[in-house]
């Protein structure tokens, strides 16, 4: 069972890296949200979202990963980003 334990450790390390990368992504998107709020740009950019999903679906297919899974994951991520951008915008409006 040592091999199972070793493989699970590898999975745990990868999961940790995924969470760290998502955190980094959100830090950057927070900056984008602030720029959008300062420039009165809408939080939601449907064309950009579609571009991201399409690019990641292609990437996932090239890596033999289910593109529907990747779409689902990133739609959740993007939904959280838009919600955060709205909160950033609303915070700015409350200070004016």
Predicted regions and their residues:
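Domain-level signature for soluble enzymes in the chorismate/prephenate branch of the shikimate pathway
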Residues: 1-96
């Amino acid at each position: 069972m040592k091999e199972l334990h070793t493989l699970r450790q590898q999975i745990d390390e990868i999961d940790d890296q995924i969470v760290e990368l998502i955190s980094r992504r959100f830090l950057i998107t927070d900056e984008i949200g602030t720029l959008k709020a300062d420039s009165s740009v809408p939080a939601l950019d449907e064309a950009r979202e579609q571009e991201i999903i399409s690019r990641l679906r292609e990437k996932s297919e090239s890596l033999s990963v289910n593109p529907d899974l990747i779409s689902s994951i990133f739609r959740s991520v993007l939904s959280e980003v838009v919600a955060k951008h709205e909160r950033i915008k609303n915070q700015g409006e409350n200070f004016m």
